[in-house]
Amino acid sequence: QSPIRSPEHPIPLPARALNGATLCVEQLAFRYPSRPDTLALSELSMDVAAGDTIAIVGPSGAGKTTLFQLLLRFYDPEHGRILLDGVDIRSLALHDLRNMIGIVPQDTVVFSANAMENIRYGRPQASDDEVIDAAKLAAAHEFIERLPEGYQSFLGERGVRLSGGQR
């Protein structure tokens, strides 16, 4: 059970944050409760402008996952703070915060379903046309059309019927 909770009176997200927000990470330091003698992050600072897309890369153990766990407030930092449009994320409702952050993990997840349903997973109410539009935006449409049954092709458990690059 996580001790992290939404504040009793959360601050609403600023209107412009709905279309992208500035991110300011100030002097973050963090230790996992299970490893109190080891700093997972030490004095991390960075600024990301609204609308920018960034990649967090580094060797195993560098703190990439830890940073995202702090951004999503699975933990709070020992020291420092994270601001979205100047608002400390500890002042935001967890639901609002987590809904505005997108993460692309290093390992893909492919469900035991067809291509259409795998894409639709991110937005269950999407129409077939919207799913196809999303595939086109992701430069996957032509590849999917070449599958034996197109969008209805079963991809196998964890995508075993696809190559690593196709996943």
Predicted regions located by residue number:
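ABC-type nucleotide-binding domain
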Residues: I4-R167
